[in-house]
């Protein structure tokens, strides 16, 4: 019985691992994790699709691929970054997600408010 449970658990872990990151097929090749498929449609002729790494801080980025899952110029941003309009003329760039820094400030603020409530209770 324990053996059957162990096998079931192992299969479940494998299924979840595969669901997390599907490899991207691009121009007949599979892209590595943390990359996307880009096909530059500008210029004299269309380039063949190629794998590119996900955007890093301040890199140009795109949010939506076309119907085939291919981006026209740039990959979306990597983990912890969001594609945000920056400067003039509002170009999209990878920026740190505002939620992360706000959350850390919020947690600091809640800690401070808890401390002040505790000090009121002990003094009052």
From Swiss-Prot:
Where is this protein localized, as stated in its record?
A: Secreted
Q: Where is this region: Disordered?
A: 93-124
Main localization, broad class:
secreted
Q: Where is the signal peptide?
A: 1-17
Provide the disulphide bond pattern. 26-37, 31-51, 36-75, 61-83, 77-94
A Gene Ontology cellular-component term: extracellular region
Which organs or tissues contain this protein? Answer: Expressed by the venom gland.
Transferase in keyword set: no
Q: Which GO terms describe its molecular function?
A: toxin activity
UniProt keyword annotations, A-Z: Disulfide bond, Secreted, Signal, Toxin
**Which residues lie in Acidic residues bias regions?**
109-118
Gene3D superfamilies from the UniProt entry: Lipase, subunit A
Listed Basic and acidic residues bias regions: 93-108
Q: What is known of its domains?
A: Consists of two fundamental structural elements: a disulfide-directed beta-hairpin motif (DDH) and a disulfide-stabilized antiparallel beta-hairpin stack (DABS), which are covalently linked together.
Q: Which family does it belong to?
A: Belongs to the neurotoxin 32 family.
Q: What is this protein's record name? A: U33-theraphotoxin-Cg1c
Record organism:
Chilobrachys guangxiensis
